[in-house]
């Protein structure tokens, strides 16, 4: 059966990185496909016996974007195995990436008036407006603080999972970097004892045994994990019945290194029976340097 992955989202958020990863994974990839050709291309891929296809669609054909949600719905209704991933990033990060790459935003010419070149921020704002209907319907990955290597790993984990009633993701993050925009539920664990103030534990992470042992020694830590797990076990069935395909549970502490990482790892153990289950750590850990 043909599997289709559609990559879309804000320009500068990492669509090219995601598409290259899928190409390396054996997907037949096409970039910047106009929406009007999407159904025809997928039908041709099916007739040619292809098994995996990845397509990137961006804002360069803005007049057609309004049709994309309807096209996706129609293709799914016809039995197409279609997974849509929407990549996003905060405006500050996008502006920084454009500055580093020295590339023009694809909407620059569209917004030019009387020889006046629009600002990058104006282009980003218009693009957000154009893509908002699609963003609200699909799985969103906020790439603001992800390295290219982390994004490749996240996309790989996501597409390798068969389409389930609900993909459950636990992710840790640092409040000092902001709450990730892809989070459906956010739990603040900054009230828990902080290993950062123990000099021997400071360079470690919540995945290291000394930190895990230290945190497990506090009753309040176990109570926090029990309460979060209890909430999820009570309400996961309801989220599933709501035809939701993804649920991202974000756990945050100050630096995203100790407490949130530990809590995420413990929750992953408690929900190990849920398939598929994804675990993400937004703060770059020592073995995530690529």
Curated annotation (Swiss-Prot):
Source taxon at top rank: Bacteria
Alphabetic keyword roster: ATP-binding, GTP-binding, Nucleotide-binding
Gene Ontology molecular function terms on file: ATP binding; GTP binding
Residues that coordinate or bind GTP: 58-61
One Pfam family in the UniProt entry: PapZ_C
Annotated TM spans: none
Annotated ATP binding sites: 9-16
NCBIfam families xrefs: PRK05416.1 (NF003828)
Family in the record: Belongs to the RapZ-like family.
Reported function: Displays ATPase and GTPase activities.
Protein's recorded name: Nucleotide-binding protein Bpet0443
Organism the protein comes from: Bordetella petrii (strain ATCC BAA-461 / DSM 12804 / CCUG 43448)
């Amino acid at each position: 059966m043909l599997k289709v992955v559609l990559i879309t989202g804000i320009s500068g958020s990492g669509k090219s990185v995601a598409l290259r990863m899928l190409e390396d994974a054996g997907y037949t990839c096409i970039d910047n496909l106009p929406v009007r050709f999407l159904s025809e291309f997928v039908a041709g891929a099916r007739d040619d016996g292809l098994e995996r296809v990845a397509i990137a669609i961006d804002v360069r054909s803005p007049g057609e974007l309004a049709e994309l949600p309807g096209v996706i719905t129609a293709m799914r209704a016809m039995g197409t195995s279609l997974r849509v991933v929407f990549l996003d990033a905060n405006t500050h990060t996008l502006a920084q990436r454009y500055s580093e790459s020295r590339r023009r935003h694809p909407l620059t010419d569209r917004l030019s008036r009387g020889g006046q070149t629009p600002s990058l921020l104006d282009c980003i704002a218009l693009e957000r407006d154009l893509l908002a209907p699609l963003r609200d319907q699909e799985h969103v990955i906020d790439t603001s603080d992800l390295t290219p290597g982390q994004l490749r790993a996240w996309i790989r984990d996501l597409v390798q999972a068969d389409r389930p009633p609900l993909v459950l993701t636990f992710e840790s993050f640092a409040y000092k970097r902001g709450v990730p925009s892809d989070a459906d539920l956010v739990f603040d664990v900054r009230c828990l004892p902080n290993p950062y103030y123990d000099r021997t534990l400071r360079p470690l992470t919540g995945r290291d045994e000394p930190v895990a042992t230290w945190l497990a020694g506090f009753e309040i830590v176990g109570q926090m994990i029990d309460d979060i797990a209890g909430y999820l076990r009570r309400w996961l069935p309801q989220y599933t019945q709501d035809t939701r395909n993804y649920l991202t549970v974000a756990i945050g502490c100050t630096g995203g290194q100790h407490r949130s990482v530990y809590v995420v790892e413990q929750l992953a153990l408690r929900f190990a029976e849920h398939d598929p289950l994804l675990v993400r750590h937004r703060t770059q850990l020592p073995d995530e340097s690529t």
